[in-house]
Amino acid sequence: MFSKLRSLIFKLDPEMAHSLAIKALKINSFPKKNVVKSNLIKTTIFGKVLNNPIGIAAGFDKNAEVYNPLFKLGFGFVEVGTVTPKSQYGNEKPRVFRLEEDKALINRLGFNNSGAEKIYSRIASNKPNGLLGINIGPNKNSENRLEDYIICVRKFYNIADYLTINISSPNTENLRDYHNHKQLNKLLESINNEKSNLNSKTPIAVKVSPDIDDENIEKISENLIKHNVELIIVSNTTDSNRQNLININKLEKGGLSGKPLEN
């Protein structure tokens, strides 16, 4: 059954297949009784007990449309986004490419999302039934990226169980400059100042690139500790590790995910 369904899905454009998955989750009901629970895999994070440590990363439910159906399927947590202050289309299509032989995917979506206002309203009107993280980032053409992060912190701090600061997507030009010691220090200092102004205790996570050298790993770690960042998300997609890939789509620009990321 699964192999036949997989074969059918893989005949579709990958972004269309993703859209169909979102639509299917919106209209179907999945009974909770089918979800296996065990005390052996219960996990506590940010003071909340999760039934299991398996969650959905940002990038699947970009616009916070199906987080509750995902909880109903049994996921321990869901992270929505990446959300930017203003809605944006992202990069031009096609922008998602399968590499079947390599068990991988390349995407250059570019933070396509409905924008902070609409996504906030959606979450506020549909209470999450589990741990919900909100992944935030700057608009593509923003003149002040640091301020974009602050706008999103201000918008979502009171409805997110945690906020993820995305500094690592390879599909937003120069975003990874925030891995630089001085820039990251300024960003985290500004976010903590804003949290203080808001009297917010919302935990902060930082999502980093897998392409960091050892020297910068140490510097970034020092920064995260200095600013009391509660969680590190490792990792985003890579723009390296392509030399041994087979599929011709390896030449496409974008972030690589899947099995090659293990190397």
What name fits each language-model region?
Residues 33-56, 118-128, 199:
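N-terminal amphipathic alpha-helix/helix-capping segment at the start of soluble metabolic enzymes
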Residues 138-150, 205-225:
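Active-site glycine- and acidic-residue-rich loops that bind
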Residues 50, 66-88:
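Active-site cofactor/substrate anionic-group-binding motifs, chiefly glycine-
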Residues 81-131:
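A gly/proline- and charged-residue-enriched helix-loop-helix capping module
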Residues 2-43, 107-112:
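An N-cap/entry alpha-helix motif that binds or orients negatively charged groups
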Residues 86-95, 116-118, 125, 171-200, ...:
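Active-site-adjacent beta->alpha loops and helix N-cap segments on the catalytic face
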Residues 22-36, 170-183, 217, 223-263:
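Glycine/Thr-rich beta-alpha phosphate-binding loop at enzyme active sites
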Residues 54-58, 76-80, 107, 132-136, ...:
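Hydrophobic faces of well-ordered beta-strands that scaffold small-molecule active sites
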